[in-house]
Curated annotation (Swiss-Prot):
Stretches of the chain forming a coiled coil according to its record: none
Function recorded in the entry: Catalyzes amidations at positions B, D, E, and G on adenosylcobyrinic A,C-diamide. NH(2) groups are provided by glutamine, and one molecule of ATP is hydrogenolyzed for each amidation.
Keyword terms of this UniProt record: Cobalamin biosynthesis, Glutamine amidotransferase
Organism: Ectopseudomonas mendocina (strain ymp) (Pseudomonas mendocina)
Pathway entry: Cofactor biosynthesis; adenosylcobalamin biosynthesis
Gene: cobQ
Name listed for the protein in its UniProt record: Cobyric acid synthase
Length: 483
């Protein structure tokens, strides 16, 4: 069955977005389609139906394709836990930590896993849409490449090259990328897509004509810059603020070096009654109604950084004045008395003092907990759904059950004064009733209902509309083998 790959001239060129759009576009035409990313490097991950983890972008693409996320959609996931190393996840399961040089030698094994997953998807679906990583023209990464042209050559698939015109230099990006590829790789590029264009397309046409003449390859279309568009970012935290009313609930998130699953905060950013502020290194925590300690890939190191910034003192002051504090996953572990890492899973083996705001201790264990869960929040008995991705096992009387899970377990805890709440569950704010209950707990009255999952579905539909309106659908159908 056909495979079509999308590669980008740079990171954040629009690869994830275009694959998401094409998945829904193909599904509209009655095609059984699956997303695929050979290798992903990201700290945002999702739990799959088969009990593993993949990049969140592939989970969103699965939604666009009408599928449950599966580990075959992202067979190699790298989760950085230091400047030189990462946790390596193969077929949804962590196999250990590797330094960059060690992983380079491991790539043939990783490539075998990639090809196994791709073969299974090809057997099950009529079309596989593949997302590359970064740029295919990184000279230092070409040897042993499994994420871009190395994969395309191995499975003999055509490639669409996408570039972001909003950043400037789009023609240099496209032509320069093409020039740095080998002749066989150049032949795989079947066309270009220009992303995030604003203005009069007539003014761009001379450049498009030149590009086609210079390269001998067609421009498949120009996608517009979309406003009010909110699919999750794959990597960097989006710290842009949106102006809200003076009565908005003030929510502050300290940005720690190894913050993970920052997509947890996207629903807060979109809520019209919430002013979300990310605080970075060297910045003071401003007055707030709610402070949220996020997930972390290196909890002890991030907790040390939190203290270096003086944010622990700011949190204590915030609580003295009646503010609320929420810890999610690694943030929950920080709320306890001790964090023990006897196996050195996140750095040097040892223990660290927690913030001591809830009475429990955490031990980091090699076996990671991966679950999609449902249950009831202790606040208003609101229905909640989410997912667990953590290596820690937490025990102690302070874990009195912030969430009662449908599988019979309890999760997290709430302090006796009701000011501090901790949970292992990511995705807390995606369920409307739990979202509203948490906002009321934090001090917001007359809460407007926001259904983040419905907003995501709306934006996926909008993306598919853009493909139908602005790309050469006949050429796309030919590349996808759709008759």
């Amino acid at each position: 069955m056909p495979t079509l790959m999308v590669q980008g001239t740079t990171s954040d060129a629009g690869k994830s977005t275009l694959v998401t759009a094409l998945c829904r576009w193909a599904r509209r035409q009655g095609v059984s389609v699956a997303p695929f990313k050979p290798q992903n490097m990201a700290l945002n991950s999702a739990v799959t139906a088969d009990g593993g983890e993949i990049g969140r972008a592939q989970a969103v693409q699965a939604q666009a394709a009408g599928l449950a996320p599966h580990t075959d959609m992202n067979p190699v996931l790298l989760k950085p836990n230091s400047d030189m190393g990462a946790q390596v996840i193969i077929h949804g399961r962590a196999i250990g930590n590797m330094q960059a040089l060690t992983y380079h030698g491991y790539k043939p094994v990783a490539m075998a896993a990639v090809l196994e997953s791709h073969a299974r998807l090809v057997e099950r679906h009529q079309l596989v849409l593949v997302e590359g990583a970064g740029s295919p023209a990184e000279i230092n990464l070409r040897a042993g490449d499994i994420a871009n042209m190395g994969f395309a050559e191995a499975v003999d698939c055509p490639v669409i090259l996408i570039a972001d015109i909003d950043k400037g230099g789009v023609f240099a990006h496209l032509v320069g990328t093409l020039e740095l590829l080998s002749p066989s790789e150049q032949a795989r590029i079947r066309g270009f897509v220009i992303n995030r264009f604003r203005g009069d397309i007539a003014l761009l046409k001379p450049g498009l004509d030149w590009l086609e003449q210079r390269t001998g390859k067609p421009v498949l279309g120009v996608l517009p810059y979309l406003t009010d568009f909110h699919l999750e970012a794959e990597d960097a935290v989006d710290t842009r603020q949106q102006a809200k009313s003076a009565q908005a609930l003030r929510v502050v998130v300290p940005v720690l070096p190894r913050i993970s699953n920052h997509t947890d905060f996207d629903p807060l950013r979109l809520h019209p009654q919430v002013q979300l502020t990310f605080v970075g290194p060297g910045q003071a925590i401003p007055p707030a109604d709610l402070i949220i300690l996020p997930g972390s890939k290196s909890v002890r190191a991030d907790l040390a950084r939190l203290r270096e910034q003086g944010w622990d003192t700011a949190i204590a002051r915030h609580l003295r004045y009646g503010g609320k504090l929420l810890g999610i996953c690694g943030g929950l572990q920080m709320l306890g008395r001790q964090i023990h890492d006897p196996h050195g899973l996140e750095g040097a083996a040892g223990s660290s003092e927690g913030l001591g705001l809830l009475d429990f201790e955490t031990v980091l264990e090699p076996e990671k907990q991966l679950r999609n869960v449902r249950g009831q929040l202790c606040l208003e008995q609101a229905q909640v759904s989410g997912y667990e991705i953590h290596a820690g096992v937490s025990r102690g009387p302070g874990l009195n059950g912030a969430v009662q899970l449908d599988d019979g377990r309890s999760d997290g805890g709430l302090s006796a004064d009701g000011q501090v709440l901790g949970t292992y569950l990511h995705g807390l704010f995606e369920q409307p009733s739990a979202f509203a209950a948490l906002l009321r707990w934090a001090g917001l009255h007359e809460v407007q209902t926001v259904d983040y999952q419905a907003l995501r579905e709306r934006d996926i539909e909008r993306l598919a509309d853009q493909v139908e309106l602005h790309l050469d659908n006949e050429q796309l159908r030919m590349l996808c083998g759709i008759r």
